Amino acid sequence: MANIKSAIKRAELNVKQNEKNSAQKSAMRTAIKAFEANPSEELFRAASSAIDKAETKGLIHKNKASRDKARLSAKLAK
């Protein structure tokens, strides 16, 4: 455990940020799974939006976001 006051604060903030990041990533995965279970235009838009939000927040790399969206788009076109 941290001894310095600023380190204690940073540790607390890290825990909070980790929870936010985990929730955002989980929401992205849930949206993708919902689309894969039942491909539709509406679910594609929701999944694509979730991927973009995760990429903007730095949770996933931009190339992974692009790759995931391309795969979803290909599945929608089928």
Curated annotation (Swiss-Prot):
The terms describing its cellular component in GO are: cytosol; small ribosomal subunit
Name its species.
Streptococcus pneumoniae serotype 2 (strain D39 / NCTC 7466)
**So what family is this one in?**
Belongs to the bacterial ribosomal protein bS20 family.
| NCBIfam families (UniProt xref) | S20
- This chain belongs to the protein called Small ribosomal subunit protein bS20
Q: Which UniProt keywords apply?
A: Ribonucleoprotein, Ribosomal protein, RNA-binding, rRNA-binding
Single annotated GO MF = structural constituent of ribosome
Which HAMAP family would you find in this protein's record? Ribosomal_bS20
Which PANTHER family does the entry link to? 30S RIBOSOMAL PROTEIN S20, SMALL RIBOSOMAL SUBUNIT PROTEIN BS20C
Q: Which InterPro entries match?
A: Ribosomal_bS20, Ribosomal_bS20_sf
Pfam families named among the record's database cross-references: Ribosomal_S20p
Q: Name one GO biological process term.
A: translation
Summarizing the function annotation, the protein's role is:
Binds directly to 16S ribosomal RNA.
